[in-house]
């Protein structure tokens, strides 16, 4: 273990960086950003039109979606007025009621479908302040399902978790946490972004910090999981709270998840800079004390629902086109790009379709799934409960990776559907399709709700968005707010989706169910077959968080 030497070396490294910076004043403005993906660099595929579309419905969908879009207005209402949508929470219920009311305004039938129960939790306010050796407000975010401080401030000295290697070591350390606030993860040695380190730091400094960070992270990796009852044991031993920090590669950006179920212990994510300060103060025995206030309410197991909107098919009501996007989120901020953008895309697409194409041939469904963040539970329950939809599915179109315009799609498990998707795109305006590249077949996947259809062998398509560095900047972070949405791209995606749905609904032929052979994915030597759907979790009894 190199904890104390780490911080001694860090001071030396910081001095080197400071001296280097002092020798280079006025280095100049930041480099001008360049649009790396305005258009793909390869030649446009044959499905990108060189002339205007001729289908009158396509033209009307374009006009309605691009000139009278409601996407930005809907997103602002959801994200600013309602906010995050934790599975089973009162705020999720409020957001789902908003969905029902808004669809009613559109003239669209929508309903809640219960698929199980989940432990419900209500968020209140939360604060933390350093009180010694100086006074400072701390940047904190109470984790979902956190315990509370019973309506009052609670104060304690700050200690660092012992990086124990056995239950016996943990038990020996446990009495020391009484009345304490426990730091339970490794800090970052620097909260500067990697781009700054690469541009400004000396190579020796960068290599040294990288090595020290790897060692420090390895020391504390998984320390709260080595004993399954870590949080409840720490609470029983009299700890005031647990602090953790999950830095996400940008200053001020942390990933925020949930605290373990039934721990009933106040748990906080702390900003990178403040967490590092607390860790250094504790390790250097400089007497840090913190007081916290956490308001929350555990409401027990409550019913959980998907919201399903529907336009009944006029001639093929037992065949379906599904618009798919999960509606639940974590609570670091508002859940904007994960996945309000996907939800609003599908909602706005259905509004456009209802306005322009109110009598589709096939039945159109929108699935606003709950429980995705806990394991595709809402969509998995829907496909298990509705075999008629799985059997009659023409296509499901799923969107769940951020705000950017759609730039990729593919046939999933069914290679013969690739030309079909290309044929659909050949009827759309090039303003939409010029950005899109059609991929080859892929596996079942597990990262989003299209997997809940694919695992049954049904044709489900992912609509892949331009990154905007989604994985680091907004995915599950405390900065996933309305301002991160690119409304022009949202408008673009909703219009594109409406056209896909219209063309899939009117397709004279059924989509292919011929599977790629072998199905990609899995362990070496593993043969994947369908159906291969796991059993969705319909309650929280086996869920850790």
What do these predicted ranges mean?
Residues 5-16:
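Bacterial N-terminal signal peptides
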Residues 73, 262, 351-377:
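Short helix-loop-beta-strand segments that form the rim/entrance of peptidase-like active sites
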Residues 55-57, 132-139, 145-171, 257-336, ...:
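Soluble metallo-hydrolase cores and metallopeptidase-like ectodomains found primarily
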Residues 266-270, 280, 351, 470-545:
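His/Asp/Glu-rich mid-to-C-terminal helical/loop segments that flank catalytic regions of hydrolases
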Residues 58-66, 80-91, 156-164, 170-172, ...:
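Second-shell loop/turn segments in exported
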Residues 49-89, 115, 125, 249, ...:
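N-terminal capping segment at the start of a domain
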Residues 133-137, 151, 156, 161, ...:
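Metal-dependent peptidase/peptidase-like ectodomains
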Residues 26-56, 76, 80-213:
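Noncatalytic luminal/extracellular "stalk/propeptide" segments of secretory-pathway proteins
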């Amino acid at each position: 273990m190199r904890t104390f030497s780490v911080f001694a070396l860090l001071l030396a490294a910081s001095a080197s960086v400071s001296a280097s910076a002092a020798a280079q004043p006025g280095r100049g403005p930041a480099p001008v950003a360049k649009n790396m993906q305005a258009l793909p660099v390869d030649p446009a595929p044959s499905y990108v039109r060189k002339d205007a579309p001729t289908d009158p419905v396509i033209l009307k969908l374009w006009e309605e979606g691009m000139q009278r879009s409601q996407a930005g207005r809907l997103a602002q209402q959801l994200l600013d007025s309602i906010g995050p949508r934790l599975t089973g929470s009162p705020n999720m219920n409020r957001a789902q009621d908003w969905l029902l009311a808004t669809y009613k305004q559109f003239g669209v039938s929508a309903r809640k479908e219960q698929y199980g129960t989940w432990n419900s939790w209500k968020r209140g306010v939360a604060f933390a302040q350093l009180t010694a050796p100086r006074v400072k407000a701390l940047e904190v975010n109470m984790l979902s399902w956190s315990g509370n401080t019973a309506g009052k401030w609670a104060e304690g000295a700050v200690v660092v978790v012992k990086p124990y290697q056995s239950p016996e070591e943990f038990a020996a350390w446990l009495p020391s946490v009484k009345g304490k606030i426990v730091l339970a993860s490794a800090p970052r040695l620097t909260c500067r972004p990697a781009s700054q380190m690469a541009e400004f730091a000396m190579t020796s400094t960068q290599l040294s910090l990288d090595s020290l960070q790897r060692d420090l992270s390895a020391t504390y990796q998984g320390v709260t999981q080595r004993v399954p009852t870590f949080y409840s044991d720490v609470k029983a031993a009299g700890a005031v709270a647990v602090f953790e920090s999950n830095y996400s590669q940008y200053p001020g950006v942390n990933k925020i998840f949930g605290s373990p179920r039934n721990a009933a212990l106040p748990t906080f994510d702390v900003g990178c800079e403040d967490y590092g300060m607390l860790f250094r103060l504790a390790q250097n025995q400089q007497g840090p004390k913190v007081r916290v206030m956490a308001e929350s309410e555990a409401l027990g197991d409550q019913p959980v629902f998907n919201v399903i909107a529907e336009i009944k098919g006029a001639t093929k009501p037992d065949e379906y086109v599904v618009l798919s996007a999960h509606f639940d989120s974590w609570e670091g901020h508002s859940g904007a790009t994960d996945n309000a953008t996907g939800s609003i895309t599908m909602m706005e697409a259905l509004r456009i379709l209802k306005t322009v194409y109110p009598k589709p041939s096939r039945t159109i469904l929108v699935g606003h799934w709950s429980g995705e963040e806990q394991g595709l539970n809402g969509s998995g329950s829907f496909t298990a409960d509705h075999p008629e939809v799985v059997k009659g599915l023409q296509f499901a179109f799923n969107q769940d990776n951020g705000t950017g315009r759609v730039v990729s799609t593919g046939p999933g498990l069914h290679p013969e559907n690739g030309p079909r998707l290309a044929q659909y795109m050949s009827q759309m305006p090039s303003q939409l399709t010029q950005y899109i590249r059609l991929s080859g077949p892929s596996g079942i996947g597990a990262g989003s709700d299209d997997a809940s259809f694919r695992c049954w062998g049904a044709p489900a398509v992912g609509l892949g968005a331009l990154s905007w560095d989604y994985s680091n900047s907004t995915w599950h972070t405390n900065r996933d707010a309305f301002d991160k949405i690119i409304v022009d791209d949202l408008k673009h995606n909703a219009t594109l989706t409406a056209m896909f749905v219209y063309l899939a609904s009117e397709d004279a032929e059924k989509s292919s169910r011929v599977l790629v052979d072998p199905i990609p994915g899995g362990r070496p030597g593993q043969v994947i077959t369908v159906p291969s759907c796991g059993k969705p979790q319909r309650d929280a009894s086996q869920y850790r968080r």
